[in-house]
Amino acid sequence: MHIARFCLLSSMAVLALSAGYVSGAVIEIPDEILDSARFISLYSDGLRQKRQLNLSGPGSEHAGTIRLDGQRNIFDNGRTRVDGTGSYQLDYARGMKPIHGAGLGAEVNHNIWRGRGGQSLDLYGGATRQFNFGNRPNEWGAHGGIRYNF
């Protein structure tokens, strides 16, 4: 069990260093978190990824969050682009069960106008679905608008 904890802490440190973000220090990780390490290690390669690791110390009851975000281009014909997104989040605190969450989403961008100097005017819209496994309700989100790039 000590080897598994060491491996998990080492992988968390690598995630944190690659993200450039660490807060506080890890003192103890509940055993339930070790079960989640398998999912994190299976997270697919080839995505544009953002990793965030937030670990806090004794002042906040050994609480923290591990979040992985990925984005992949699904379709692109030069004027219309569709990107898919996915995320996994693990919230934990000493004395409580970890809360897992996953999200899926898509965004569509359509170019309306393109200038000679590289400017562009785009319409965009997207939706996300957050699945929370625990006591929190699932959530929907939507966004859209006009984007001018200069």
UniProtKB/Swiss-Prot annotation:
<keyword id="KW-0964">Secreted</keyword>
<keyword id="KW-0044">Antibiotic</keyword>
<dbReference type="GO" id="GO:0045087">
    <property type="term" value="P:innate immune response"/>
</dbReference>
<feature type="signal peptide">
    <location>
        <begin position="1"/>
        <end position="19"/>
    </location>
</feature>
<keyword id="KW-0732">Signal</keyword>
<dbReference type="GO" id="GO:0005576">
    <property type="term" value="C:extracellular region"/>
</dbReference>
<dbReference type="GO" id="GO:0042742">
    <property type="term" value="P:defense response to bacterium"/>
</dbReference>
<keyword id="KW-0391">Immunity</keyword>
<comment type="function">
    <text>Has antibacterial activity in vitro.</text>
</comment>
<protein>
    <recommendedName>
        <fullName>Probable antibacterial peptide</fullName>
    </recommendedName>
</protein>
<keyword id="KW-0399">Innate immunity</keyword>
<keyword id="KW-0929">Antimicrobial</keyword>
